[in-house]
């Protein structure tokens, strides 16, 4: 299912045993391969980057380990989280959750549409221009309203991987953007 959803997408993976195989497949498809949390794995297999959660290694430390040329993203739930990631020179921010999701345990407070509007407005006011990716419980029908808030990207792993045809679900979502 993961391979069927690769076309035209970025993929964030947490499963170490299949990382090398997925990296090769991502290269074939021209997809970006970001590993969740595992900085040493990113370095070892030369993945495109790492996504760091709120309790993970600081961005600056990951940058020291990886060096330049790797994407380093971080998780945020508040404007204070975003300010910190901006100071640490993150390349992008995964911000959420939008709503309850089954793909992540121990969720931070839900943001909803108004939360994203407020965060995007505050980022603009403060001159923080990091790409902001909405994440957490997002379904196909949420995409237009979320994009209207000013977020730069939307993570939709559940909506894609649980679809009868992940490839078609991804294609439909790409066509909406």
Task: Explain the meaning of each model-derived region.
Residues 1-8, 12-13:
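Single conserved hydrophobic/aromatic residue that forms the stacking wall/gate
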Residues 5, 21-25, 84, 145, ...:
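Alpha-helical scaffold elements within enzyme catalytic domains, especially in hydrolases
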Residues 9, 54-62, 94-107, 143, ...:
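Glycine-rich phosphate-binding active-site loops on the catalytic face of alpha/beta enzymes
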Residues 17-35, 54, 62-77, 109-133, ...:
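Alpha-helix-loop-beta-strand connector modules within alpha/beta enzyme cores
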Residues 22, 36, 82, 95, ...:
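Conserved PRPP/pyrophosphate-binding segment of the phosphoribosyltransferase/PRPP-pathway fold
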Residues 30-32, 40, 49, 57-59:
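Histidine- and aromatic-rich ligand-binding microenvironments
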Residues 35-48, 77-89, 128, 132-134, ...:
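Catalytic cores of alpha/beta
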């Amino acid at each position: 299912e993961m391979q069927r959803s690769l076309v035209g997408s970025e993929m964030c993976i947490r499963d170490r045993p299949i990382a090398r195989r997925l990296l090769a497949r991502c290269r074939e498809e021209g997809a970006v391969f970001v590993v969740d949390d595992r900085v040493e794995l990113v370095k070892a297999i030369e993945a495109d980057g790492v996504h760091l959660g709120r309790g993970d290694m600081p961005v600056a430390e990951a940058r020291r380990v990886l060096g330049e040329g790797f994407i380093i993203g971080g998780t945020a739930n508040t404007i204070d989280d975003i300010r910190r990631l901006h100071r640490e020179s993150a390349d992008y921010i995964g911000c959420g959750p939008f709503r309850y999701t089954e793909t992540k345990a121990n969720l931070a407070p839900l943001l909803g549409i108004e939360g994203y509007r407020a965060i995007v407005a505050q980022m603009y006011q403060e001159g923080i221009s990091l790409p902001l990716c909405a994440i957490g419980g997002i379904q196909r029908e949420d995409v237009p309203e979320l994009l209207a808030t000013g977020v730069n990207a939307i993570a939709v792993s559940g909506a894609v991987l649980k679809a009868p045809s992940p490839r078609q679900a991804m294609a439909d979502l790409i066509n909406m953007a």
